[in-house]
Amino acid sequence: MTNYFLYISTLILLISCEQNNNQQQEQQQENPTSDSLAVVNDPKNNLNIQTNSFSEIDSSGVLIFPLSMGESEREEGSLSYKEMPNNGYWNIIFYNSKTKEYKLLSERKMLIRNYDYKYGSGDNDNFSQTTNHIFYTVCTDDFNKDKKLTYQDPQYLFISDKFGNNFRQISPTNYNLNNWKFIKSSNKVIMTVGNDSDKNKRFDNSDEITTFEIELDKGVETNEVFEGDFKNKLKILFDRDWKRLK
C-alpha cells in the first residue's frame, strides 16, 4: 500500500511539472509579440541622437561632442518629449581618439547653454598654459517651477578638467550667472551673479548683482568679494546723494 501511494504521489508531481513547463513554453511563445509591441510603442524609439558638431581640445586627441536630440513624430503627429531651447545641449560626449574611450560629461539632468575651453587664449596666449579647465554655463534647477529647464532658470558656472572629469558647480546656487572672468595672475575666477531680490521667481534689472570669487585647484568654496558692512555703506551713500526730494 505504501508503495502504491508513493507511486501515485510521484505521478502527480511529474504531471504537475509537465504542465508548468507547457505553460512556460506558451508564455515564451507569447512574449516575443508583447516585447515587439513594447519596443514599437516605446517613445525612446522616436529619438534621434544628434552630434552636429565637434572640436578637439588643445591638440590632445580628445574630442567633445555637444549633444542635441531630435524626435520623429508618431503617426498621429504627437511628440513625447519637451522641446529644448535653441542653441542648448543636454549633455556632452568626450571621446579620446587615441584610446577610443568615451564618456558622458554627467548623467544629471541639465541644460548646457555654452562651454569654453579656449577662454583667455587671446594675444597669442596658449590657453593650455593658463588653466586645465573647461568652463560651462549650465541650468540645473527648475527655479520658477514650470517643470522644465529654460533660460529663465538660473545659469550656473561649472568646470571640469579637459577630459570631462570632476564636473562641478562653482557659482552659488539660486544666483543667476551674469558675467565671469578667469584671472591668470591669481588663479581665480571672478563672477557677477544676480539674486532674485524681490522673490518673484525672475531675474531682472531690479535684482541685486553680487560679486563672488573662487580660487581654482584649492578645493575651497566660492566666497562673496564685498563684505556686508561695505555693501551697507554703499547703500547709505546712495541714499544720501540720490534720494528723491519731496
Task: Describe the predicted segments one by one.
Residues Y89-N96, T150-F163, S206-G219:
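Beta-propeller blade signature
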Residues N144-Y151, D196-N205:
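Acidic, glycine-anchored loop motifs typical of Ca2+
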Residues Y95-F158:
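Extracellular-facing segments of soluble proteins and assemblies that are Gly/Ser/Thr-biased and enriched
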Residues S106-K109, I170-N174:
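Surface loop/turn motifs at the tips and blade-to-blade linkers of beta-strand repeat domains
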Residues E18-S36:
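Bacterial Sec signal peptide processing site at the extreme N-terminus
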Residues L111-F135, N174-I190, N223-K246:
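Conserved beta-propeller blade repeats
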Residues L13-S16:
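C-terminal motif of bacterial Sec signal peptides marking the signal peptidase cleavage site
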Residues L63-L67, E71-S78, F135-T137, K188-V193:
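Residue position within the beta-strands of beta-propeller blades
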